[in-house]
Amino acid sequence: MADKLFINALKKKFEESPEEKKTTFYTLGGWKQSERKTEFVNAGKEVAAKRGIPQYNPDIGTPLGQRVLMPYQVSTTDTYVEGDDLHFVNNAAMQQMWDDIRRTVIVGLNHAHAVIEKRLGKEVTPETITHYLETVNHAMPGAAVVQEHMVETHPALVADSYVKVFTGNDEIADEIDPAFVIDINKQFPEDQAETLKAEVGDGIWQVVRIPTIVSRTCDGATTSRWSAMQIGMSMISAYKQAAGEAATGDFAYAAKHAEVIHMGTYLPVRRARGENEPGGVPFGYLADICQSSRVNYEDPVRVSLDVVATGAMLYDQIWLGSYMSGGVGFTQYATAAYTDNILDDFTYFGKEYVEDKYGLCEAPNNMDTVLDVATEVTFYGLEQYEEYPALLEDQFGGSQRAAVVAAAAGCSTAFATGNAQTGLSGWYLSMYLHKEQHSRLGFYGYDLQDQCGASNVFSIRGDEGLPLELRGPNYPNYAMNVGHQGEYAGISQAPHAARGDAFVFNPLVKIAFADDNLVFDFTNVRGEFAKGALREFEPAGERALITPAK
């Protein structure tokens, strides 16, 4: 690769040439060099005057702006933003990405239909299914169907709530009102669509989106309960049941338990979170939630790094950065993986190396390949930091660099072998090589999991090993070290992207997010982050309708 993908960003960030070894500090104007910090200062003064309590004051504590307060290019875009605009609190797109995951649950109709036909002796047809879907799309946002004197939600406040279905049977899908159908044939390339339909078969599955405002006010575990209540009421109404008859219990069981797929599993009590919270979302699920693979299927690097960006934001910025630690600094561990095209450059190098030497997914799935590919990519990355001092200043933390280099090594190894476990092994080897070269990786404890992780890559034992696609933020040793989990998710995607697989872990999850009615566009994760940073993203769940006009 003659042109480094990160060069333009370095030239935009710094006055000096990227190869220059000298710069200046302390004479840059402090926080005033940043438009966003200046805006914050003015806003903080207004807040303080209004409430009578001092607020934002960057002159307290360590002075800001001793170095360049650099802009960031959101990778794969031409958009440059300030770092503050990539904090999830300041970015509506990032918030909505998590909202759209948390408020989703997949519920089968197969058990319910069996109850209707076998217990109640009623017929289930495409017409009755469409009638049920009309009913549940009335009820799911928070409206009543079988009770009188019920309070209801304002439709404009919950406009993002709806229910769709999908099936692997084209004949059934064609008979249901298309407004309610996720059309697998339209949303996926032909070969992916055929694979997914074969996985689903004749089953019919509902994709439920509860209102953003509900999951924000409550929590992720509310999603399946809210969903089950409205599904149960809609079944009673659509199939004209007596609400107290015995079969009602079967419907409740089907809607709440029997065929329910959460986006995240229940966490142990010491972390005190229910289903559909970030700590329970497996890496393979997150890879399937990201939809890059159905539009960028010829570019495994783009597909894998879109998953990295998705995971870096969710796992590092929201889960570890706030749920677990309560801090604000974790943002910059995440942004290193999706800004300035640095990880992109390193990973495209690795992909080209693999293609030239082996072919994608053609290398032996063994340690010789891990040693070859991960070493080559790691040394390439470290050489870039040596050659371009501005790159070191861009990723000023050792843990940022360690995560980026190891992610490129891991993805590239997975491209070679077609296996996520050897990709993970490539990650750990990269960490060892990096520490050997630079004597350190990051802050104290950053590399805890990297020092012990290699021991359970290929051993599948209780609490000591799992296929990477099944691991998640709550996997032992992964629980608190930033700069890892999003990258692991990308490595879990990498072999499947290189092979052109239709999904990574769960075909139902992949299909559920192939939905044009979602507020967040999961086919273009980094582009959506950029829109949020520019304040151009329109989120759901806003309360302007019920607040005083200004």
UniProtKB/Swiss-Prot annotation:
Cofactor note: Binds 2 coenzyme F430 non-covalently per MCR complex. Coenzyme F430 is a yellow nickel porphinoid. Methyl-coenzyme-M reductase is activated when the enzyme-bound coenzyme F430 is reduced to the Ni(I) oxidation state.
GO CC terms in record: cytoplasm
Top EC group: transferase
Record-listed S-methylcysteine modification sites: 452
EC number: 2.8.4.1
Main location: cytoplasm
Cofactor: coenzyme F430
Entry binding sites for coenzyme F430: 147
Lineage per the UniProt record: Archaea, Methanobacteriati, Methanobacteriota, Methanomada group, Methanobacteria
Modified residues (5-methylarginine): 271
Modified residues (1-thioglycine): 445
Gene that specifies this protein: mcrA
2-methylglutamine modification, residue list: 400
Protein name: Methyl-coenzyme M reductase I subunit alpha
